[in-house]
């Protein structure tokens, strides 16, 4: 796959609908905002969280970093999938604003889109955001992106962070 620019509905069709369900080992997602996105599966719309729960059922390790607590509809969908409670690894970091999806350490999307229906292009043409990003399998891009994700995950910046009082998931207590 060549590194390429993707935008709007392409983010949904190529990343959310096609590549994420093909994840085999690990899926890392970082987003500032997260909402109860619905996606097409076998001709019907289902919560994206169902897709994540199914991946976990296949042994995929999933890490999610987000910047704020999701709303009630997301929490209700989350509660429907018990695997998520036990196996979805999650960190809330109020300073996160980068958005990325890293699939098996070999494919990555990074760009402007939050993990929401409007952001990822899952909503209808006149309701989705104008978003863009890069889809790549280039190690020279994936490695620093993975390092940024992992540094937030392991709390590399927590010691000197000025927002620890707003951070319920700080990995260093």
Question: Residue spans of the language-model regions?
Answer:
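An N-terminal domain-start capping segment
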Residues: 1-21
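Short, flexible loop segments at the rims of nucleotide/cofactor-binding pockets, characterized by
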Residues: 3-8, 39-42, 85-88
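Short His-Asn-centered micro-motif
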Residues: 7-9, 29-31, 65-68, 91-94, ...
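Short solvent-exposed loop/turn micro-motifs enriched in small/polar/acidic residues
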Residues: 13, 91-95, 127
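Primarily the HKD phosphodiesterase
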Residues: 19-84
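Short, electropositive alpha-helical surface patch
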Residues: 77-87, 163-172
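Short beta-strand scaffold segments in enzyme catalytic cores
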Residues: 99-102, 134
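Signature of lipid phosphatidyltransferase scaffolds
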Residues: 107-173
């Amino acid at each position: 796959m060549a590194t390429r620019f993707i935008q709007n509905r392409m983010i949904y069709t190529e990343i959310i609908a096609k590549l994420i369900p093909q994840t085999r080992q690990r899926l890392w997602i970082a987003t500032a905002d997260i909402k109860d996105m619905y996606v097409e599966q076998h001709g019907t719309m289902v919560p994206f969280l169902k897709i994540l729960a199914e991946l976990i059922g296949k042994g995929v390790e999933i890490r999610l970093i987000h910047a704020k607590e999701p709303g009630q509809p997301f929490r209700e969908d989350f509660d429907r999938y018990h695997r998520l409670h036990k196996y979805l690894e999650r960190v809330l970091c109020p300073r996160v604003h980068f958005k990325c999806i890293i699939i098996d350490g070999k494919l990555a999307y990074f760009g402007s889109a939050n993990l929401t229906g409007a952001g990822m292009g899952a909503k209808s043409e006149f309701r989705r955001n104008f978003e863009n990003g890069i889809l790549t399998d280039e190690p020279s891009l994936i490695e620093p992106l993975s390092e940024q994700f992992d540094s937030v995950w392991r709390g590399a910046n927590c010691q000197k962070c000025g927002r620890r009082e707003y951070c319920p998931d700080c990995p260093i207590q």
